[in-house]
Design a protein with these regions (language model features):
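Walker A/P-loop
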Residues: 15
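Post-Walker A helix-loop "phosphate-sensing" segment adjacent to the P-loop in P-loop NTPases
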Residues: 23-32
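ATP-dependent small-molecule kinase phosphotransfer cores
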Residues: 37-99, 103-107
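Hydrophobic anchor at the beta1->P-loop junction of P-loop NTPases
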Residues: 6
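ATP-binding Walker
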Residues: 12
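Small-molecule kinase domains that catalyze NTP-dependent phosphoryl transfer to phosphate-bearing small molecules
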Residues: 145-197, 202-210
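P-loop (Walker A) phosphate-binding loop of NTP-binding proteins
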Residues: 9
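Conserved phosphate-donor/acceptor-positioning beta-strand/loop module used by diverse small-molecule
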Residues: 98-106, 119-143
Length: 210
């Protein structure tokens, strides 16, 4: 068992990298970890594929029952509080597969602690997805059409939050990968497949090692 954790700011392309890595993995060796969230689904997001979407009451119940191995609460621009997290049943620690998840720095530290507690602390590889700030902002604005003022404010809030809670992960993660264009995205996806198969080429070809 191995866990690859992708860490990166809003609109850094983490989802695109993950999907491309799974597309390249023809043998199904990499298993995507699906996070659970209490935020509303975006257009075209599918429950059980992109996220497990739950309401606030269900989220509180799951927290009370200690079902999450990591989670974080976000207060968004309209005052709502959203929960994102990974449930313990998403990762089989006895499996011979490689799991891949998208996570923030706080969640990464919780995941790291959880894996150490179950004797799998050496099975975690964390990769920071680095993108120029201007590109991230443009992607965020283009991701949704006809943005309301509240949605624009939320994008701004996320970017400010990233500087505090995500960008420090660049120094914390095992390695850093640039993702400023489609070519970078493909390289990142290939590297993830090398990591999943214990292929040393990922170390030689990584864009920036810590």
């Amino acid at each position: 068992m191995k866990v690859i954790a992708l860490v990166g700011c809003t609109a850094s392309g983490k989802d695109s990298i993950l999907k491309e890595a799974l597309r390249i993995d023809k043998q199904g060796f990499i298993i995507p970890v699906i996070s659970t969230t209490s935020r509303p689904a975006r257009e075209n997001e599918i429950n059980g594929k992109d996220y497990f979407f739950i309401d606030h009451n269900k989220a509180d119940e799951m927290l009370k029952n200690d079902e999450f191995l990591e989670y974080r609460k976000y207060k968004v621009a309209d005052g709502s509080i959203w929960i994102y997290g990974i449930t313990k049943n998403q990762i089989d620690i006895e499996s011979d597969k490689t799991y891949i998840c998208i996570i923030d720095l706080q969640g990464l530290k919780q995941l790291e602690s959880y894996l150490k507690d179950v004797g799998k602390g050496d099975k975690l590889v964390s990769l920071f997805v680095d993108v120029k700030a201007q590109i991230r902002l443009m992607r965020a604005l283009q991701r949704e059409s006809d943005l309301t003022d509240i949605q624009v404010n939320e994008i701004c809030r996320r970017n400010l939050d990233d500087y505090k809670n995500v960008i420090p992960g660049k120094k914390y993660c095992s390695a850093v990968m640039e993702n400023n264009n489609k070519n970078d995205m493909y390289k990142c996806a290939m590297l993830i497949n090398h990591v999943a198969r214990n292929d040393d080429r990922w170390i030689k070809n990584i864009i920036c090692m810590k």
